[in-house]
């Protein structure tokens, strides 16, 4: 069962998503991956941030109310 993140709510904030990524990587004992992931998340627009997040955590989370133009590859 995956968690649903409403991207139009406070959990859809880019800073919240980066903090969530940090938290989950810590819980998975993979904190060393965060700096590279954060750099990749910040290297483009909001849709890029969402794609990077989904690539890493797609088995844990689903997005609700994704912005127009966002497509999860």
Region roles according to the model:
Residues 1-73:
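Long, contiguous binding/interaction regions
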